[in-house]
Amino acid sequence: SDDAVIKGTQAYWRFDRHEAGSPLSQLDVIKDLSGNCNDLILKTHFPSDKNTLRWSDAHHPSQPGHGSLNFTAQKKPLKGMYLQTRNGAKINSNTFENGYTFEAFYYLPSSWDSEQNAWSSLFSRRGSAGDAGIHGEEADKDEPIVTLSISNDRELQWRVYPLESQNGTTNWGHETPFDQWWHAAVVNNGSMTKMYVDGSEVARNPAQKAHGLTTLNKPWMLGGFEYGGKLDQIFYGSIGDVRIVDRAISPEEFMFRPDLDSSTGK
């Protein structure tokens, strides 16, 4: 059994055991190691060089899996590759009413460029606020209903539209330093949401209530971001292990375990 598959794990993806530097192909399927069949399939925004998404053996020192995906996409003109769950995957309809924990390891290289790479997602849910019937004063009808984004200042942004709400909620992380691996976690206990970076709670967590996540039963994307219902941006950088759990977990349960040096394999 995999230690990273804890109680309530809905999806767990890792990217090790591949030839580093080789591109992904349309035949590659990222298996969901939780056993829930929420596998990821490759999507390409044409025209794209097939080398815009590659396997890598780079990883955060405390990451369970010893590998990652290296994305080299751009916005103008939009090109690149991303992954998504299949239509009908169980996790597409999950509303996380009892809480959630989303975790991802990520890395931004110093070649990251705000003009080309800002407002991309580590992961996001397809479907816009407007399509979900959300029209509050602070709602942006074109925004995706769930996204963990990288802003123009390289800040993490968890921007979501909770259930029974006509407006979204936002958690902000700090500016991400280049050329270093980070662990991001967003934890909701059914009513409040907190973001953590490398196990520490960020300063800008909102006080407003947030219950569950709106869904239009569409796929989740890894590395893709929609705006106005169309693909708008693709990630630039690297993404390591990603885990989604349908409950709030404590920082001690995070995949980020600084007490473990993964090079020992323990």
Q: What do the PLM-derived regions correspond to, one by one?
A:
Residues 156-183:
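Short, aromatic/His-centered strand-loop micro-motif at the edge of beta-sheets
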Residues 120-159:
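Glycan-recognition/cleft segments
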Residues 205-238:
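Flexible glycan-contacting loops in extracellular carbohydrate-active proteins
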Residues 1-4, 42, 70-100, 168-175:
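Short surface loop/edge beta-strand patches of beta-sandwich-type extracellular domains
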Residues 1-80, 133-142, 210-211, 254-266:
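Extracytoplasmic low-complexity segments
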Residues 1, 10-20, 101-110, 232-261:
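Extracellular, beta-strand-rich glycan-interacting domains
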Residues 15-22, 107-113, 128-129, 162-164, ...:
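Acidic glycine-/aspartate-rich tracts in secreted/extracellular proteins
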Residues 180-194:
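Localized edge beta-strand/strand-to-loop motifs within extracellular or lumenal beta-rich domains
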